[in-house]
């Protein structure tokens, strides 16, 4: 069994390699949903873009590096490989596939979402994640919004709203995770 360690900083990559990781998955801030990091507070503070992160990690470790976050089409794949990645991981780009079984409302929103149409928020779960800029997500980061409870309390507090929004195909209440490049996927 091979161990793939998802990281968001060079120091995490070095620590993962020292701990025995066989492959490092470098996740840039462009990625949708929660960040895969050993230290969530470091990931929140650093927010490093993929094309800065990949070459820095490739230079720092001696195991294969997979680029993740913001890759959704052949141009992104070629760029990541040129920067030294051995492979890429595509997330949001595959959410529009039938096998993902997300709502048509969410899939259609991803198709028309520009990079600036995403937002980073703790509102859904208490952990920082990138979502489509829905009414709830935008309201959650306003100056008047209460500070979200920590994970998993916030996740439990928003469960009914998220479940109902999904049943009703109401994007504005959904946990509509999406990366910044999702609309590039065909």
What are these regions (language model features)?
Residues 1, 21, 85:
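Short phosphate-binding/catalytic loops that engage adenosine nucleotides
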Residues 34-66, 71-186:
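Conserved active-site-proximal phosphate/metal-binding subdomains
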Residues 4-6, 27, 66-68:
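A cross-family glycoside hydrolase active-site/sugar-binding cleft signature
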């Amino acid at each position: 069994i091979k161990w793939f360690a998802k990281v968001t900083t060079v120091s995490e990559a070095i620590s993962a390699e020292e701990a025995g990781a066989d492959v490092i998955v470098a996740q840039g801030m462009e990625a949708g949903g929660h960040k895969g990091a050993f230290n969530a507070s470091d990931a929140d503070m650093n927010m490093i873009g993929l094309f800065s992160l990949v070459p820095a990690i490739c230079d720092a470790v001696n195991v294969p590096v997979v680029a993740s976050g913001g890759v959704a089409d052949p141009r992104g794949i070629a760029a990541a490989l040129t920067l030294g990645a051995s492979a890429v991981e595509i997330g949001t780009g595959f959410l529009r596939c039938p096998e993902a079984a997300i709502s048509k409302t969410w899939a259609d929103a991803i198709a028309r979402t520009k990079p600036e149409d995403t937002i980073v928020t703790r509102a859904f779960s208490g952990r920082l994640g990138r979502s489509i800029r829905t009414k709830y997500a935008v309201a959650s980061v306003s100056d008047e919004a209460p500070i979200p409870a920590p994970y998993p309390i916030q996740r439990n507090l928003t469960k009914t709203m998220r479940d109902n929004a999904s049943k009703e195909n109401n994007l504005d209440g959904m946990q509509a995770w999406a990366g910044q490049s999702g609309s590039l996927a065909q």
